[in-house]
Amino acid sequence: MKTRAVRIYGAQDLRLEEFELSLVGDDGVRCKVISDSLCMSSYKIYMQGAAHKRVPDDVATNPTIIGHEFCGVVDEVGKNWAHKFKVGDGFVIQPAHSYQGALTAPGYSFRECGGDATYVNIPWETLHMDCLLPYNSDVFFYGSLAEPMSCIIGTFHAMYHTRDGEYVHDMGIVDGGKMALLAGVGPMGLGTIDYALHCDRKPSLLVVTDIDDARLQRAASIYTVEHAKSCGVDLHYVNTGKLDNPIETLRALSGGDGYDDVICFAPVKQVVEQSDGILAVDGCLNFFAGPGDPAFTAPMNFYNVHYNRTHVAATSHGNTEDMREAITMMNAGLLNPAAMITHIGGLDCVVETTANLPKIPGGKKLIYTQIDLPLTAIADFAEKGKTDPMFAKLDEIVRACNGLWCAEAEKYLLSRML
């Protein structure tokens, strides 16, 4: 079977092309990809090529498919996996299979598996490590967002706290504690707000910062202070770009003691310093944003490390259980990560979009891999609808859903384009 996919050949060399997939055989599974959400990690692959830790050295001659936040349906099953999968089953991928400690992952390392493709053959490692997960929903974009949501969930689980005089680490955020999300209204920050408000272990105070008023206002319109209050959380949005002394102001918002849990969403020295500066005694700083620069450093107050037990954690991905939690919460209506999505497009726009990802404003770019469609901002549907009835209808649908991409919009788009 032929697939159409975006493959990387080296630094700044992505190509959309068609090629033949290997036969599935007895020990394989083939899947049809419906949706993939683009991640900044794919931009890092684009920039670094074979220098990226997850990308093989020989991609110039054996290119790999990019995209790791994907969802679709099982298309063919070898007899050795027939007990577990059947044709037509929905699936999502947990790319971080960690087989024997390896960094290889779909969307980075495999010639025949990645999200920006029409059809893929699932790697043996993914199957063996139980990372091809069942997805019992016909809303595909939620499945694509299960992977980024699992990264957020993993972050909450990776936070830890200590006990003075005891050699114990208590895992997770402080239940009923104080939490701050710095540079926290990008797509991953929005997902974090959603999870913080609706998970079973939540803060009593949540402060979210950024330096962009428009992004803060959008976040506040989706996750309102009033809704947070109904969840038992005192939510504040703060533009630190307008503050003379952000650390002082943020500490004052905490009541002067600082924050138990702080997540830093930007690999920017100033933001890291602010994150460190607002930690409470035994405060945990999670450096969520992976820097592209191997030499990136930022100061940390080691007086507070010694006397106040401040400490750092870092997470780059979730695990399979985190993804299962994300799927369960989405299916139960407890999470709605649609706020992360600001653009939609088809497979034909992936190369240009990935290459320019940092320059394109907004949040997640959602790709429907079975169609061709220029990258289009949800905010531009109304304008495009003046000449295109499809976009006029999509605009009507999303307006009824607080301006967010939704199941009805997805179903309408695919019914028109497939």
What is the predicted function of each stretch?
Residues 273, 289-309:
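Rossmann-fold NAD(P)-binding glycine/threonine-rich loop
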Residues 176-177, 182, 193, 197-271:
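Adenosine-nucleotide cofactor-binding segment
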Residues 22-36, 51-100, 114:
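Glycine-rich beta-strand-centered segment in the early N-terminal region that forms part
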Residues 163, 244-249, 257, 270-277, ...:
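C-terminal hydrophobic helical "lid"/dimerization subdomain
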Residues 189-190:
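N-terminal Rossmann-fold NAD(P) dinucleotide-binding loop
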Residues 57, 97-177:
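NAD(P)H dinucleotide-binding glycine-rich loop of Rossmann-like/cofactor-binding domains
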Residues 148, 184-186:
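Glycine-rich Rossmann-fold phosphate-binding loop(s) that bind the pyrophosphate
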Residues 261-268, 277-296:
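ADP-ribose/adenylate-binding Rossmann-like module
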